[in-house]
């Protein structure tokens, strides 16, 4: 079975249609798998604000997501979160680290998200998510993820200072061209697996996403990862950052691509009693 948690509160959104993107994805999953999502947070307008403003604004949503994720992760179902932004993972990754201390987090993202308040050039909260979960700075929402538990997959747009932090911390990186199913299996070994995906990991044009960069992964590579991870070892999945097109047909096409990528794992989870 699948527990579906959907973030609908603003969490550092800088683009207008991220919350709608999460809602569209969730509705499609509900229809495909007969689910009833747990919707968290109240939508608010996007803003180009600094992390120091966005983080306290998002507190209520992050706390609610953490509580919902904790309840699900302690159970037997596959935990699935559909998030408007990667910043929501500030609430979830510490829970994963606490409840599954031997888990490997596959952080599938075009960026490293390993900046800190001291290194960020943009002030964007979403660029500091993995570093916060690893305790390099205090988000107020917990930490506990050991850097060696994290594997950056498909990451290629990494700031110079951020790259040094990644190197010193010991976070593993699998570039897009090397992100095969076998490479991922070699990285996770026999550990439980948590998958975080920001759709900007894909080659631009595959899925409408914010902060896209060239030379990305292809949808077939993402699907291959879901096919390769044994169902009994997959403990949770986060899907983030669909910047939903205003045109309904294009939005539906994007969601269809997403559902095809995750189908191997979600079909297996839905079939479990």
From Swiss-Prot:
Coiled coil: none annotated. The keyword Hydrolase applies. GO terms for cellular component: cytosol. InterPro entries: Ureohydrolase, Ureohydrolase_dom_sf. It is an enzyme of class 3 (hydrolase). It comes from the Bacteria. Its cofactor is Mn(2+). CDD domains: Arginase-like_1 (cd09999). Disruption phenotype: Cells lacking this gene do not produce cycloserine (DCS). It catalyses: N(omega)-hydroxy-L-arginine + H2O = hydroxyurea + L-ornithine. Its EC number is 3.5.3.25. Involved in the biosynthesis of the antibiotic D-cycloserine (DCS), a cyclic structural analog of D-alanine, used as an antitubercular agent. Catalyzes the hydrolysis of N(omega)-hydroxy-L-arginine (NHA) to yield hydroxyurea (HU) and L-ornithine. Belongs to the arginase family. This is N(omega)-hydroxy-L-arginine amidinohydrolase. The lineage of its organism: Bacteria, Bacillati, Actinomycetota, Actinomycetes, Kitasatosporales.
């Amino acid at each position: 079975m699948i527990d579906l948690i959907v973030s609908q509160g603003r969490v550092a959104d800088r683009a207008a249609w991220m919350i709608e993107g999460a809602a569209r994805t969730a509705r499609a999953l509900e229809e495909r798998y007969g689910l009833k999502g747990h919707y968290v947070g109240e939508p608010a307008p996007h803003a180009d604000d600094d992390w120091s403003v966005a983080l306290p604004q998002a507190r209520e949503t992050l706390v609610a997501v953490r509580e919902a994720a904790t309840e699900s992760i302690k159970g037997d179902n596959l935990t699935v979160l559909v998030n408007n932004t990667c910043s929501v993972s500030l609430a979830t990754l510490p829970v994963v680290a606490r409840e599954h201390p031997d888990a490997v987090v596959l952080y599938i993202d075009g960026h490293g998200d390993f900046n800190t308040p001291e290194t960020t050039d943009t002030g964007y909260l979403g660029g500091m998510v993995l570093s916060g979960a690893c305790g390099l700075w205090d988000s107020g929402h917990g930490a506990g993820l050991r850097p060696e538990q994290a594997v950056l997959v498909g990451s290629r747009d990494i700031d110079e200072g951020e790259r040094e932090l990644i190197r010193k911390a010991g976070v593993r990186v699998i570039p897009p061209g090397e992100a095969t199913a076998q490479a991922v299996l070699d990285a996770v070994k026999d550990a439980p697996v948590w998958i975080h995906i920001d759709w900007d990991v894909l080659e631009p044009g595959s899925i409408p996403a914010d902060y896209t960069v060239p030379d990305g992964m292809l949808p077939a590579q993402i699907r291959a990862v879901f096919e390769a991870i044994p169902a009994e070892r997959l403990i949770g999945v986060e899907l983030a950052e669909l910047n939903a097109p205003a045109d309904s047909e294009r939005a539906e096409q994007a969601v269809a691509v997403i559902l095809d990528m995750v189908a191997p794992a979600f079909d297996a989870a839905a079939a479990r009693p």
